[in-house]
Amino acid sequence: MRHRKSGRHLSRTSAHRKAMFQNMAVSLFEHELIKTTLPKAKELRRVAEPLITLAKEDSVANRRLAFDRTRSKAAVGKLFNDLGKRYANRPGGYLRILKCGFRAGDNAPMAYVELVDRPVDGEALVGAAE
């Protein structure tokens, strides 16, 4: 029985899931907007939001924890230099998931995952639409 088991398997091994969400979190922090399937988007929240909460307090220990979870120096730098300061007064809820229809090949429900309060300019909207 599968009682009290949290999280989605997504037809992947645990190592594959961990690597996938690690990569998705790095992409989200880099671009601030990504497009993925709805179940992956909902599960990505469980990975990305605690990292942003960690970045709100800049310390060597927190930077090492963030690097351990992302394995990307660029992502850690952006987390602590930009995102941690941007969300310093927000008590959670850093991500927004917007449903955006269904994928053409397999009809999978798709969604955009974006950081709330991100700076929006005309170029970012053109890049997101493509």
From Swiss-Prot:
One annotated Gene Ontology cellular component of this protein: cytosolic large ribosomal subunit
Pfam families linked: Ribosomal_L17
Similarity comment: Belongs to the bacterial ribosomal protein bL17 family.
GO terms of biological process kind: translation
Keywords from the named record: Ribonucleoprotein, Ribosomal protein
Keyword ATP-binding appears in the UniProt entry: no
SUBUNIT field: Part of the 50S ribosomal subunit. Contacts protein L32.
Organism field: Azotobacter vinelandii (strain DJ / ATCC BAA-1303)
Keyword Ribonucleoprotein: yes
The name this protein goes by in its record: Large ribosomal subunit protein bL17
InterPro entries in the record: Ribosomal_bL17, Ribosomal_bL17_CS, Ribosomal_bL17_sf
Transmembrane segments: none
Lineage: Bacteria, Pseudomonadati, Pseudomonadota, Gammaproteobacteria, Pseudomonadales
Molecular function in Gene Ontology: structural constituent of ribosome
